[in-house]
Amino acid sequence: MIRIFKTKKLVSILTLIVITSFSCKDENVLDNLDQNNLQACHDYLLIEKTIIDIEREIEHAFISTQTTKNIPNYITINSDTSNQDTLIIRFGEDNFLHLGHLKRGEIIIIYNKFLYDSGANLSTTFSDFYINNNLVQGNMILKNTGLNQNENIEFILEINNMNINTENGIINLNGNYSKELVEGGGSEYLYLDNIYNVVGSANGNSVNNNSFTINITEPLKYNLFCFESSSCIITNGIVSVNPSIYGERILDYGDESCDCEISAIIEDESYPLIIN
């Protein structure tokens, strides 16, 4: 009888351990599935800001009238047979602080016309190019489609397999955007007075390898005058971010300020984000 009792007791203890173990695992699963996870928001904001900085480098290069003596060097290679030119922005092999960020490597632009001319087509790739020690890879295509119905210059921006290699992992993005130049079109050699309204959508992967999609639900205002005091130029607008394993997040870019503060909204709860 005593032996039977001990066996029953042992079975009961083992059963309790197993039940407790599975209960703990269930709780861990629930804890790990953080419904307030903002990884997709952080990663999209980083790659968005990287694209904006590259676009600024391209605009800055196009308004330069001659090759500079200091880094970065602007090198133009003509190809008469194809009616295309190549513009290389060369920062060198070591980090160089330019337009607010550390850069090294090359940005390579193949183009057929000046940036602000109707029909201009710019295809941009990279050679060992880093921004703030993050390796940038992929392709950007910018097309000037001429004047729209509002008599403003309109651009189409295609993002093709853009990768940002960070210390935490790789961020990937593919997207299509429309950029309307609503102010500054009359002074094509002074890009800091440009204001764009931007709409579009994209899909990508975060550093945690979870996929996401984004859609601009209220046009983003790109105020390039903000470059005078900040590296953040989006002063208002709304973006919907939809990670594959979480619910919708809303990015609210603010109220016309040239700051780097953005609100991520999840089910009416607001979480401040700061980009730099």
Walk through the language-model features, giving the residues of each:
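Low-complexity, intrinsically disordered segments exposed to solvent
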Residues: K25-N276
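Hydrophobic alpha-helical targeting segments used for export or membrane insertion
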Residues: L14-L16
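C-terminal motif of bacterial Sec signal peptides marking the signal peptidase cleavage site
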Residues: T20-S23
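Bacterial N-terminal signal peptides that target proteins for export
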Residues: I2-V11
